[in-house]
Amino acid sequence: MAQRHSDSSLEEKLLGHRFHSELRLDAGGNPASGLPMVRGSPRVRDDAAFQPQVPAPPQPRPPGHEEPWPIVLSTESPAALKLGTQQLIPKSLAVASKAKTPARHQSFGAAVLSREAARRDPKLLPAPSFSLDDMDVDKDPGGMLRRNLRNQSYRAAMKGLGKPGGQGDAIQLSPKLQALAEEPSQPHTRSPAKNKKTLGRKRGHKGSFKDDPQLYQEIQERGLNTSQESDDDILDESSSPEGTQKVDATIVVKSYRPAQVTWSQLPEVVELGILDQLSTEERKRQEAMFEILTSEFSYQHSLSILVEEFLQSKELRATVTQMEHHHLFSNILDVLGASQRFFEDLEQRHKAQVLVEDISDILEEHAEKHFHPYIAYCSNEVYQQRTLQKLISSNAAFREALREIERRPACGGLPMLSFLILPMQRVTRLPLLMDTLCLKTQGHSERYKAASRALKAISKLVRQCNEGAHRMERMEQMYTLHTQLDFSKVKSLPLISASRWLLKRGELFLVEETGLFRKIASRPTCYLFLFNDVLVVTKKKSEESYMVQDYAQMNHIQVEKIEPSELPLPGGGNRSSSVPHPFQVTLLRNSEGRQEQLLLSSDSASDRARWIVALTHSERQWQGLSSKGDLPQVEITKAFFAKQADEVTLQQADVVLVLQQEDGWLYGERLRDGETGWFPEDFARFITSRVAVEGNVRRMERLRVETDV
């Protein structure tokens, strides 16, 4: 026993000596001379918290001092009493360029108080003041989005920092908390809370899809997707939303989301156990009908923002004339009213029947009787686009007022143009949504007939919208060209006609043959106007004046593509030519009734291809649906607005059949209505799934047969 007691006493002495040595205390338990007191300045303690943990050399024991030194409790030790304002974190988890939403900032004082209260009562621990969405998406130094950082382990975050004991450079952090200042040049984004897919019930809606209204630009209806004709994806759970990419001059929404709550997720559907009693096909039909309802609500929500933020803006109104204001917004109030009435009827049907019988009759009635404001709005599109471009380029006051409005959180960081084109987008998507509903009702003859009638009614409306837009554009073009073309050197041609419109116009090099040499000017010397029935060859005198040299009817024209190496020399022989991209146009019967040959050259291969396609336009009409199944298809990834007559305007998510590729440009046929034209290749991605390609062709066939498009 004595030996055991001696060993215990020795262990206590050694332990006491170790504590005093490591904490650098004197015999009385106080800090040794030269060391800061425990209750010193916060700055000294803060700095000390980041010093390396290096054991201090053992202090010599005072002579004659044999009793053990007093033990200091851990809660009263200098380490426990330190109140630092710094923290070392892995560099991989720190992003200096990440902008936080100012509304979510929390003062340091409030944070300290909340921690003290939580220490006394854990139930008072507040919820985090940051959004997980802020941590979910980040950008690496190359600008690429990196996702799921919140799921990244601490070990993965430490990768690349070296071992804990390495000789890496220390990161010096400022001990002061810096307030984040708002950047006035950066557009406000929508609140992160609006990006969360939630079924949170509000007091007024009880789990309604109205709880979290989304902008129509941010969603893509599942009914537009034909990659799986079985449409199993329409039953999938909603994927977590991604942040919308910053919008530049081109309207791009990288992260389309499903249209809010699905029918299967509705509380009344879940509580009543309806899903257990339905077949898979009936559930798909209910989802297709409900998606028309929810997407109409999103569309109506975006139209309301266009009216409240842009149309009714006094600042914007003060920078434009009354005519310019009318051209910009046209009859958008009538369009909004039509959408509200349509949505009210759909919602009333949904409230009356959780398991909706049908909505085809509602859509048919509105397409035939109430959607006529869409025709007037679409007919004004050419004036709308031209007025907007003119104001942005020449009106600084308008440009500044518009920029301020687009920064508002309600606009979601999107430009006004994305709101102005919404009626065109919605009216062209409705036939595709109705086609999906038709597929879901094929097993029920009466429902299928009703859906087919609704599809024909809405497709007829779309055709009227397209014709109205083309008619106004063509009429204005013909009147303008009538004043610019001078026929004084040739027999006059009555240019204005209701059945004539411009296909393409532009400058080309006219190659002239002089003796043994072929001469090409350093600048374009020929300006062509190609209409649907006649080709007019002119010489440009000014920006608004052209002297007509010759013309010929389209059925009296032959076109031949020629490679530079194939050009014969005027004196005979064949050798490489200096003409870069030549092609030959033969006027079999010109304005004087004789044959004339024109050797033309363009400045690029794509321009030559576009001219040849336009000049042979009538010869390409023979290709039928049967041969289009083997053509490549693309999906449009960002909206493209036609700037020339031979280009085609495309919306994001449009599907196009590719008829020709040339030098970064694609010539294709828009699936939804058969419109053809050129567009840049980098605005689209090729569809590689054979199932999706075949599904798109079948959808095109149905739309053409059912609606006579």
Curated annotation (Swiss-Prot):
Motif window: PDZ-binding motif: 707-709
One Pfam family of this chain: SH3_1
Annotated ranges, domain SH3: 629-689
Region (Required for RHOG activation and mediates interaction with EPHA2): 275-481
InterPro entries according to UniProt: ARHGEF16/ARHGEF26_SH3, DBL_dom_sf, DH_dom, Ephexin-like, PH-like_dom_sf, PH_domain, PH_ephexin, SH3-like_dom_sf
Domain notes: The PDZ-binding motif mediates interaction with TAX1BP3.
Protein name: Rho guanine nucleotide exchange factor 16
Organism lineage string: Eukaryota, Metazoa, Chordata, Craniata, Vertebrata
Name of the coding gene: ARHGEF16
